[in-house]
Amino acid sequence: MKFDKPAGENPIDQLKVVGRPHDRIDGPLKTTGTARYAYEWHEESPNAAYGYIVGSAIAKGRLTALDTDAAQKAPGVLPVITASNAGALSKGDKNTARLLGGPTIEHYHQAIALVVAETFEQARAAASLVQAHYRRNKGAYSLADEKQAVSQPPEDTPDKNVGDFDGAFSSAAVKIDATYTTPDQSHMAMEPHASMAVWDGNKLTLWTSNQMIDWCRTDLAKTLKVPVENVRIISPYIGGGFGGKLFLRSDALLAALAARAVKRPVKVMLPRPSIPNNTTHRPATLQHLRIGADQSGKITAISHESWSGNLPGGTPETAVQQSELLYAGANRHTGLRLATLDLPEGNAMRAPGEAPGLMALEIAIDELAEKAGIDPVEFRILNDTQIDPADPTRRFSRRQLIECLRTGADKFGWKQRNATPGQVRDGEWLVGHGVAAGFRNNLLEKSGARVHLEPNGTVTVETDMTDIGTGSYTILAQTAAEMLGVPLEQVAVHLGDSSFPVSAGSGGQWGANTSTSGVYAACVKLREMIASAVGFDPEQSQFADGKITNGTRSAILHEATAGGRLTAEESIEFGTLSKEYQQSTFAGHFVEVGVHSATGEVRVRRMLAVCAAGRILNPKTARSQVIGAMTMGMGAALMEELAVDDRLGYFVNHDMAGYEVPVHADIPKQEVIFLDDTDPISSPMKAKGVGELGLCGVSAAIANAVYNATGIRVRDYPITLDKLLDKLPDVV
């Protein structure tokens, strides 16, 4: 199905099932411990062996010798897999570094061996006996040190210029010129990376934890140099990903190599301390913002430049993209700079680009509003735009940023805010309020599905879409139930299997909208088949209460299956609407913090997010996404930072004892409001994504609240005690 014109009225608009706050249909499986994750397919692997990864102890250089003799002789050990005995390997298109290193070492803890044994404990013990010898090369590990060496943008991301920024900024009545930094961050998903591989002749089945089934399958086949049709990926349940499981990782490749070597199933899991250095992370940024406004507060010039680092062949953190679209302004400049760093691979983490970009932009906007003497909410409203500032002919399909800010200000009690920093106290606590705009583009990907009408009247949905804790099972079932007029309980959904039609997968906030659109497309075809089977006109038929009705005639759905189950397979492909219209999602984030006047401890007291993100397919699962994102934004603002050893090139705090994330005691009262934002330009579902929007802007709102509480402007995240303590006002 080609979606190339705005959606008209369709069966989804009935909103009998879609748009309702249904509980997650996979909830009972997860709460009873019967949902099986990648490492838990025990019945399929009664004789499984276990692999333990040995990682490089240097960040850059060469492996000069690898002695595995002692490990090989240890109890229970089967083979030790290394680059020298693994056979010829390629590299997946979406991998920056090779997943099995040697002799060249590209980053710290790049896998150099896998010890395979009868038990996990034997494999782990034997891994400590592997002796590696290296020749260490000098590496680059500090973005600040490498910044000056990077003066040109990457070839495929040139600077963007509109109007005359330099002239407009020079003559601006009010201006801000400041630098902001965000640190390297880790995904820290609850479930670690894990895989189990089984070969049957030349056919590989891999149970793994991966967000994008088709990407994983394609890159694994390429790396192993086997036909893609010989690889099957199964990933029905995923314990969080946040972008860290978008791509093929070393656990999957090494499990496949080991299983081929021992001719039996092999399980490989990355222990928590291995994940930050062995996999990917959100790269640090150094961002320079210059914004100018006229006497009335209208922005006349805006420049956002961002530096980030990555391994050779890697991509930059696109932290400037929201600054191209969020606010009006005739004169604009954005640019990315990419330094070569020898740290582990930088790649996507929840809301790549916008999340760190808004951490800087939305502080700068507050600073400029203060200089202009305008309330920060009103300043954002004053500078709203309904068109792409770089192309006045291109309008937003829907843009309710003003409504988000107005609704949020009223609900939050913004009018009671004291605009003078450091003036509100609650005992020993300084109290402040902050606001930030949220923005995330609406990305679209082709997505397919297969839908069966069974002879007993139930409906089965099959797609390789994944559920990373987001509620995919439920919203896909709601879509099929709405389209075919059956109760939600009569729909079974099967996900995460490469034998199913290729979906958009889970990433980039595109999963909900595009995967449900794929199911919609398959159901449109199935409706036609059902109508034809019972002799009805498909165009004049309605589906409700388990029946198909055409005028005065009706039939029970399962009557259409007299000749056996009916199956429809279809995909949704998006046309030029995304080029004709700018499609984005918007939010207003409001935060109250308390800062202890003596210790500098920051406590977030309450949070409010008002979101405009298309039709909300399930308010309950969508709210869960947003409050989780708000919590992640709190972590980014106040505690999360991968500490870099810039002598040896690795992340020091590579476990959850050293890398702090918010816990239940940190989470305050959280409220979420969804505006009616049904968007016929986005898809037949008229929906968009919301799981990343809930993060975008939160950290800056907290930073702005800390400033309002204390008068201390922190531009370097995270906002830790050391950045506040010696600047706090005297305790009275």
Swiss-Prot record:
Cofactor field: Mo-molybdopterin cytosine dinucleotide
Record localization:
Periplasm
- Gene Ontology annotations for the cellular component aspect, listed alphabetically: periplasmic space
Which reactions are catalysed by this chain? an aldehyde + A + H2O = a carboxylate + AH2 + H(+)
Q: What is its EC number?
A: 1.2.99.6
Q: What is its main location?
A: periplasm
The catalytic site is made up of: E692 (proton acceptor)
Q: Entry's SMART domains?
A: Ald_Xan_dh_C
Q: InterPro entries of this UniProt entry?
A: Ald_Oxase/Xan_DH_a/b (IPR000674), Ald_Oxase/Xan_DH_a/b_sf (IPR036856), Ald_Oxase/xanthine_DH-like (IPR016208), AldOxase/xan_DH_MoCoBD1 (IPR008274), AldOxase/xan_DH_MoCoBD2 (IPR046867), AldOxase/xan_DH_Mopterin-bd_sf (IPR037165), PaoC-like (IPR049648)
**One GO molecular-function annotation for this sequence?**
iron ion binding
- Can you tell me which residues bind Mo-molybdopterin cytosine dinucleotide? 241-242, 468-470, 511-512, 615-621, 625, 688-691
Q: How the protein assembles, per its UniProt entry? A: Heterotrimer composed of PaoA, PaoB and PaoC.
Q: What does this protein do?
A: Oxidizes aldehydes to the corresponding carboxylic acids with a preference for aromatic aldehydes. It might play a role in the detoxification of aldehydes to avoid cell damage.
Its family? Answer: Belongs to the xanthine dehydrogenase family.
NCBIfam families (UniProt xref) = peri_hyde_PaoC (NF041671)
Q: What is the protein name stated in its UniProt record?
A: Aldehyde oxidoreductase molybdenum-binding subunit PaoC
Q: Tell me which species this is from.
A: Escherichia coli O157:H7
> What is this organism's lineage?
Bacteria, Pseudomonadati, Pseudomonadota, Gammaproteobacteria, Enterobacterales
